[in-house]
Amino acid sequence: MRCCRVCAFDAARGPRRLMRVGLALILVGHVNLLVGAVLHGTVLRHVANPRGAVTPEYTTANVISVGSGLLSVTVGLVALLASRNLLLPRLHWALLTLALVNLLLSAACSMGLLLAVSLTIANGGRRLIADCHPGLMDHSIPLDQGPGHTDCPFDPTRIYDTALALWIPSLFMSAAEAVLSGYCCVAALTLRGIGPFRKEGLQGQLEELTELEPLECKRQENIQLLHHHQDFQALQKTWV
């Protein structure tokens, strides 16, 4: 029940919560994109062999992760716009479409990363360096020994450790992207009144909230001006 309350979108807390989710998506998307770029530059560029064949870990960990990071940033920006323009249907549909696509992509990325980490741990990283070390698929031979070791342009033990150190954070960030995108989907469905997320009277509450926001801003500006005027009068009395 508590989880349902947190995921629900209402007129009181929904806009601010949607804005925070949008900011979180932008942050997580940028970090995930950066991790994918570092992973490619430090590890996976050594894995791609000259023949153009790429290991499955490369595809799942880098391509999908980078795409999910870029899309998460886009969803975060749309969520920020939707939180400030609650009565624009186009933003609702755009948020729903992008968030749903990002939810599926982030979930696929999480499953792919989990599979890549599991396979890499299971075979001790030998699958990552199979093209450079064709003779090291034998589990009885250490990674830093065996035929082909001297021909490899990188340290295979560092490739294994670095790949896991970057994959595991990317896995958690992809899962976070999926959860945040799911909330954006719920918010968009609630704003459009579709399916079980429909709430009676929500549009009227949002219209009242939109009308009250300019009045509240003006009231705060008047209060600030009054405080400044009082401070100025107090300063004049002090000088006198």
UniProtKB/Swiss-Prot annotation:
Compartments in which it is found: Membrane
DNA-binding as UniProt keyword: no
Pfam families, alphabetized: BCLP
Keywords: Membrane, Transmembrane, Transmembrane helix
Primary subcellular site in the record, as a coarse category: membrane
GO cellular component: membrane
Coiled-coil regions listed in the entry: none
UniProt xrefs under InterPro entries: Beta-casein-like
Disulphide bridges, residue numbers: none
Membrane topology value: Multi-pass membrane protein
Membrane-spanning ranges: 21-41, 63-83, 95-115, 163-183
Family: Belongs to the TMEM54 family.
Name listed for the protein in its UniProt record: Keratinocyte-associated protein 3
